Amino acid sequence: MTSVAHEASASTGRGGEGTPLLTAGGVAKTYRTGWWPRRRAKAVLRGANLRLWPGEVVGLVGENGSGKSTLMKILVGALDRDAGTVALAGRLGYCPQEPVLYERLTCDEHFELFGRAYGMPDVDIDRSRDAVYDTLGFADWRGARVEELSGGTRAKLNLGLALLPDPELLLLDEPYAGFDWDTYQRFWELTRQRRDTGRSLLIISHFITDAERFDRVYDLVDGRTVPR
């Protein structure tokens, strides 16, 4: 059975119905460093395959340097691939590992800035922003500048900006790094709610401790995705 066929058969259950929100096939990426004649090539991805259906929580696990973040950047269009295909359906939200925040702006100003970039009406920005504050529990910091925030609150804001447009598909790179226990539990309750309404999440990490929370898990090994 091919890898693509394997992952399709593994998608039965919650997933496997309707149109996939994400399909990636044969994704390859090689980084090249140095100058001729000593130019070196390092193949990071050698044919990665992924498929996410509506209403799924999928994990992507690999060691540091295995290419997880490279694959994520390719999936969201932030990095060109050398080979392979990527097809997306619906709105996409992306929470990078390194927060994309502005030190001198407040939390409220971030939501206003990103909401307008998403093309959201002001009333929708306000409603979604307030829901994010309530869900993640950091409304008390709405008027604070990023430079005043702890690492954990920055992580909440980073995640909240990805949640703002209520995307059908949410791609998260090490999303709960820096979360305390309460926020960690809030995150998984949020994940459950989104899955129950047909939305999907792809979560990448270097380890998974709560495997039962995922519908499926891929291991990224030698540049290839291996379904568990």
Where are these regions (language model features)?
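Conserved ABC ATPase signature
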Residues: 145-152
